[in-house]
Amino acid sequence: MDPQPGATPYSAPAGCPMHQQQTSLYGPEFAADPHRFYDAARTHGPAAPIELAPGVDATLIVQHEAALRVLQNPALFARDSRRWAALREGAVPMDSPVLPMMVYRPNCLFTDGAEHLRLRKAVTESLSRLNSSRLSRDVERIADYLIDQFIERGTADLLNEYAKLLPLLLFNQLFGCPGDIGDRLTRSMSAIFDGEDVLRANAELTECLMELVAIKRRQPGEDITSWLIQHPAGLRDEELKDQLVMLMGAGVEPERNLIGNALLLMLAGDQPGAPERRGSGLLVEDALDDVLWNNPPIANYATHYPVRDIELNGVTLKAETPVLISFAAANSDPGLTDARQTLSKGAHLAWGAGPHVCPAKSPATLIALTAIEKILNTVPDLSLAVPASGVAWRPGPFHRALVALPVRFTPTAARRAGNGVQAPAQTSAQLPDPFRNAPSTPSVTPRHAQEPAKKQKGWWSSFLDVFRV
């Protein structure tokens, strides 16, 4: 992988789609059909020049073998984005929407060497203390609570009312958040993921996590925050906050996409426009494997910075420039024919590889499996409210994420509605378009419908009122 004298920077031939709109990973064309771009890129080599956002250039690795060589070679490919020359030189717009996912933070995602080992050990050993039985119970309780909010209605957006909220509330549980802090954490993380007033949301997120760390130093519990505090690495408050932010960022968005994409696959069945491997009759485990292969929740990420000019299979990767791994393209590499035929769990790169491989593969899989089984068992007649070909995907270079997942089902009574707990209201404006003008369907009258209005609580406070945890 050392530089070779004859190696030249990769350049796509004129007229190739790589020189046209598909070069940009942030447009609606890419969101609608990313594999068209990956196929075009792959015909020109293991890597391709891309634009992540206006004014933000990078290289995308699209070959499985090349991706492994980058992921497994930290001596030549660093993760510390302070090496990014264009950013240091002021050539990257500071208001770019991709910077929050790329700028340096002192957590185990953006560090190298001994510092990475110290931080990662604290994180992995804290995660290893999670009890799988307790984790499943926590997911089931949160799932029951969320399902109760829409089960009387007969319609729902399973992406925004279920897959998105479940991991947010679960992390409140795993972090040991009191009601008020959990409400603020849920609100701020939702705003950050949705790109709404990000600066204010980031400030609120920092404030509530620092408060949480202070509380857990005084009153530790059986939760990840306390375990990180107690770890022999001796993390400072700022370091604790940064690891918690990393855990939420790396856990919430991918988890909701994994749940949402798998539900789409299973509900689409044999509809035209359904994902390539039809979901009819799939077991949940098979659906998750299919998504990790074909629609990985994080499609392009794991940004590396070559420490010097490096030749990779005939392509020169310039020093101190961002090199991203396309997990989606690497998984669809034609060279993986045998592995793809069996969807071998050991061959796809959805969890990454090398020293930065995802440390939460097992709990993340358990969470998605439990969440999907719970909704399918509780609402057995779920069906898509739109054709599979009509679902929209969120634009952006990093994720493979649905905009919404509208479904219909037979309304039934909420099991905990009599407790007098009112979750944050879902208005028709928040529901996908098919529900706004749809003919009315019979529904069970909520038992709290005639109660006087109460002061609105956040999602986490409302959940705690139900379960008293």
Question: What is each model feature region?
Answer:
Residues 2-159, 168-186, 190-192, 434-438, ...:
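Active-site substrate-recognition loop segments, prototypically the cytochrome P450 B′-helix/B-C loop
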Residues 173-177, 264-277, 332-334, 414:
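Cytochrome P450
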Residues 175, 184-233:
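Cytochrome P450 catalytic core segment centered on helix I
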Residues 235-241:
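Short hydrophobic alpha-helices at membrane interfaces in multi-pass membrane enzymes
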Residues 241-248, 252-279, 359-379:
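Cytochrome P450 catalytic-core helices
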Residues 279-313:
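Conserved cytochrome P450 K-helix E-x-x-R motif and the immediately C-terminal K′/meander segment
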Residues 313-314, 319-335:
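A translation/RNA-centric and nucleic-acid-associated enzymatic feature enriched
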Residues 338-405, 413-421, 431-433, 439, ...:
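Cytochrome P450 heme-thiolate "Cys pocket" and heme-binding signature region
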